[in-house]
Amino acid sequence: MKIAFLFAGQYRDIPKDLIRYSIENLTKGLDYSIFCYSWDEPGESLDHREEIPKIKNDNNSFEQISNIFSAFNLKKIHTESYNNFLINLPKPHKEIFNSKFYHKGTIFALPQIYTLSKCYKLQENDASHYDLIFRCRFDSLYLHPLKLYPLRNFLNSSTLYNINFGRAYYPNRIYDIFFGGSKK
C-alpha cells in the first residue's frame, strides 16, 4: 500500500529537529511519498488574529522545506508568492477576501483551499501509484505513526478520515489540519 502525504499551506518557522521527528513518527513503517506546496513567504497563522498580519517577504520557504524534507521521500515541492496570489485573485474572490461581512474563517479558507488544490495537482501524474492520500500541515506535529490505524480498511472506504473524531467540534466540518483516505 502506497501513501501520498500532501503538505500544503503556509510554512511556519518551527524547529527543524522537531518537524523531522514528527514526520519520522507519522511515516514510520510506511511506503510513502511527500508532496509540498507553500507560499514563498513563511509566516504565522492568519486565522487567529482580528487583523491580518503583514506577510514577511523572506521568500525562503522553498529552501527551508527542502532542507527539512530532504531526509524523507520528497517527490515534489513548489512555492509561490502569496502577494501574487492576492493580486491574481478573481474579482468575486477578492470581494470575499476584502469583505468585512464574511467570517474570517471563510476569508482565510481561500488561501488554504488554493494551496491544497495545488498540492493535490503535484501528485496527479502519479495518482494511480497511491492507495491513500492524506493532507498535512507544516505546523502540525505527529506523535503517533499513521500505521497504528487500520489503513487497509480505508482502502475500500469512501469515508474521509479526519481529526474531527465523533464530530467533537462542528458536526459537518472537516478540519483542514489532517484528513485523508482512499481515492474513492
Give the ranges of each region predicted by the language model:
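ER/Golgi luminal nucleotide-sugar-dependent glycosyltransferases, focusing on the catalytic module
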Residues: M1-K184
